[in-house]
Amino acid sequence: MLKNSTQPAGGGNVMYPGKVPGKVKYTFAFGALGKDMIYGMIATFSMIYFTDIIKVAPAFIGIMFFAAKIWDAFNDLFMGMLVDNTRSRFGKFVPWLAVGTLINAFVFIILFTDFHLSGIGLCVFAAVAYILWGMTYTIMDIPYWSIVPNLTSDPHEREKVSVLPRIFASIGQSLIIAGFGVQIIKGLGGGYTGYHRFALIIAATFIFTIAVTVINLPKKQVGKKAEKVSFKDIFSIIKRNDQLRWAVALILLYNVGIQFIMGVATYYFAYVCNNSGMLSAFMISASIAEVVGLIIFPKVTKMLSRKKAFLLACILPAIGLMILLLTGIFAPQNIVLTVIAGVIVKTGTGLELGCATVFLADVVDYGEYKLGVRNEGVVFSLQTLIVKLTAAFTSLSIGFALDLTGYVPNQIQSLATQNSIRVLMCVIPAVGMLLAYVVYHRKYKLNDAYMKKVVSAISSPQTELTSEKTTEEAA
């Protein structure tokens, strides 16, 4: 069972108490490029590869994806526990990061290899390969993001450190894979050959970028030996860390909006705007805008505050989605207004990505301040759990909504179906994102001033970490 402790914290539990050297910052962030290229390939192309290239039944793939995401979401918590319990001369992050990358790259190549199977054998192969890929990706993804709160305790430096890997991740996943993946696959031969060659290139890039990260991470071990965490303790951590619960809640609400936008966009442009070609313009411009949002995040927080940065992150997408909704009704073929809407939406989501990473890093420090334990692995595993759970349930919700309104593939849709697509694409995401700010405003208390007190308290080896009662009274 977890107990309050008096172990040295803060300064002893971060690699750099102040400014992080540029080499460390950028080589750490560089790893996210390959990491999210491999994730983007699975997220964007695995379904069409399974159904159109190796001919797995679409109904089976839909069920498989849903089951795999649910399993993988809870597997993340287990991985977070393993990371927090790891003790080695290389620390608790690097071993999992290195081993997970190599295994995941190998499984990724196998997944995009055609073994000329059919029937039950093909279904078994697809299920095993896809689930194994998700599990092995978790092995390296959880420790990667768990490094963030351990690089520095300086608030402004943490904002910079948090945003850099998100920028590289957006370039890898949204711009390279989602934006130009189709053209690259065609250029590499198209069909199975194009997919397999592209997978080999991505796997090699993945290994190289993570190797650069691992080699340049400081070898200094942080913190003292801490009490081991059991699976039961995970729920105790969530129960006792109130700010972790509210951070999870607001990130969940926001992510519901993102998942609906990404899941419905293809249908929106094909059947509401009647122009599938507009999807590429929307996605490429939006991807660039997301990177811009991430780049300006540290400056926005410095000029305004984190609270106002998150307010912008919630309001901008709502404005952009309303522009997109009105454009779809009155000028569905207007590509300029569509691009403008996409840029506004994704500038906001770029700011949110920066905010979310900083929120979770602050929650780690707050957990140490309040409970005497950091639990980076558990905290950051909850982020990936949220993404996977919302992806699973959003996909299911979209399918049910389209079915209930009479959606017919490759046909002109009824007005009821078009309106349901509009609601799924524009209204539900906007509501989810605005609700996220309501939760933040009313329940999340780790603002700039409060975090200065937290960091000051945990940075002193002589400071005894407060009990829950003392912390709540101080708040």
Language-model features, listed with the residues they occupy:
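Membrane-embedded alpha-helical bundles of multi-pass transporters/translocases
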Residues: 2, 8-468, 472-475
